[in-house]
């Protein structure tokens, strides 16, 4: 194109788009529905809202104030002393199921067992299973234990008070040991035996393995005061 030629004007027809106006529903969404959509529930079933720790000394060590969807937070609770008190209590119970040698590291299997256990508890008791678990742990933590004092031939047993964190640790261990032993060579699954153990412990029944062990520890401590 030479310098004398004028540039050709190109006319384009642009379609005018009307401004979008959002549609407003005539009936607003109820607050209950909005809360249900935003609330975090364990396995999308069980709410943490009304769960209560009835023992004042264990409130800071039974973690139910941080809701979770699944019992696996991948947290590094072992890096610092006492940090495991911040671990959700359902996850601590799940981790305790992996303590037997052949179950080490099988977290997905343990999570499935806990999910099935909570369903069984809800069917049998018609209660929030998280509350049943918290009550069971509260009832099975021994308040008194014994320790060795002295050395050599003069060693003896001395009764001592148990710290809140150790009470929770022992309660979780006793509950899972009782469920594991009950499921061994039994037609019942470990989810069923764990559900029975938790329900009996929450009631304070002497049929619970954990309750019997707790009473035995406290009885021995009482005789060594």
From Swiss-Prot:
Annotated crosslink Glycyl lysine isopeptide (Lys-Gly) (interchain with G-Cter in ubiquitin) location: 45, 203
GO MF annotation list: mRNA binding; rRNA binding; structural constituent of ribosome
GO cellular component, one term: cytosol
GO terms, biological process: cytoplasmic translation; maturation of SSU-rRNA; regulation of translational fidelity; ribosomal small subunit assembly; ribosomal subunit export from nucleus; translation
Phosphothreonine modifications at: 27
Post-translational modification: N-terminally acetylated by acetyltransferase NatA.
Cellular localisation: Cytoplasm
Domain of life: Eukaryota
Protein name per Swiss-Prot or TrEMBL: Small ribosomal subunit protein uS7
Organism: Saccharomyces cerevisiae (strain ATCC 204508 / S288c)
Organism lineage string: Eukaryota, Fungi, Dikarya, Ascomycota, Saccharomycotina
């Amino acid at each position: 194109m030479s310098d004398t030629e004028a540039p050709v004007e190109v006319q384009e027809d642009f379609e005018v788009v009307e401004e979008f106006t959002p549609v407003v529903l005539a009936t607003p969404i109820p607050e209950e529905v909005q809360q249900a959509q935003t609330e975090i529930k364990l396995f999308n079933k069980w709410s943490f809202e009304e769960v209560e720790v009835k023992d004042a000394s264990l409130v800071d060590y039974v973690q139910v104030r941080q809701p979770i969807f699944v019992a696996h937070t991948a947290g590094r609770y072992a890096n610092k002393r006492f940090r495991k008190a911040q671990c959700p209590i359902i996850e601590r119970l799940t981790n305790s199921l992996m303590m037997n040698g052949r179950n080490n590291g099988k977290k997905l299997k343990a999570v499935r067992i806990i999910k099935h256990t909570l369903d069984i508890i809800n069917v049998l008791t018609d209660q929030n299973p998280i509350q049943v678990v918290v009550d069971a742990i509260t009832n099975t933590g021994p308040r008194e234990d014994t320790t060795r004092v002295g050395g050599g031939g003069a060693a003896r047993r001395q009764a001592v008070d148990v710290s809140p964190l150790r009470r929770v640790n022992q309660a979780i261990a006793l509950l899972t040991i009782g469920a594991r032993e009950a499921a061994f060579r039994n037609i019942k699954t470990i989810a069923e035996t764990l559900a029975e153990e938790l329900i009996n412990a929450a009631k304070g029944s002497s049929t619970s393995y954990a309750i019997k062990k707790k009473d035995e520890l406290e009885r021995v401590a009482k005789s060594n005061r």
